[in-house]
């Protein structure tokens, strides 16, 4: 809908499905790096969004998403632990572009994310296992350098981006037989950089590709590389 000040407000919904599958290695049966088991987790999501855009290109983007979790974890000795639960995620993001050169703008961005995870208690055949997690808050400050060109009559948008992420202190707890408790702290600071391109093939069809690298800049040791490519349809 069009607002009195010329801004545009859009609302909608989306659905999603995610699947995680991996191996667990560690200090097991007296050996370091020995295979301990496998984990699988699937999530089905339903979300709502609202986006306010300014004629000059500024935006405010809000998202609420609810995810149903279903997991299957099993050890090399045949013990199993089914994981069921849900996740509530809320996000608000704002940005505003400033021209810096012909065909190029720089867009400072800020974002805050709230997330609450709830998992059902389970029994793995040896002990009762319960889960408890604090609400997690994550903040992001970043910037995107974006260009706009025309190739073969079609818009082409290359971009560079950089972000600083900080997850404020939160704790996950796993309790075995109502007595033994393992805690995991969430607090961390991470930086990432990325490059990407978007090519419009038609008013409602575009293709995109991106690559990102992220690394913790605190005492936590974590590094990751990501790549994405796809086709986007709008209607």
Where are these regions (language model features)?
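Membrane translocator/pore-forming domains, dominated by Gram-negative outer-membrane beta-barrels
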Residues: 1-235
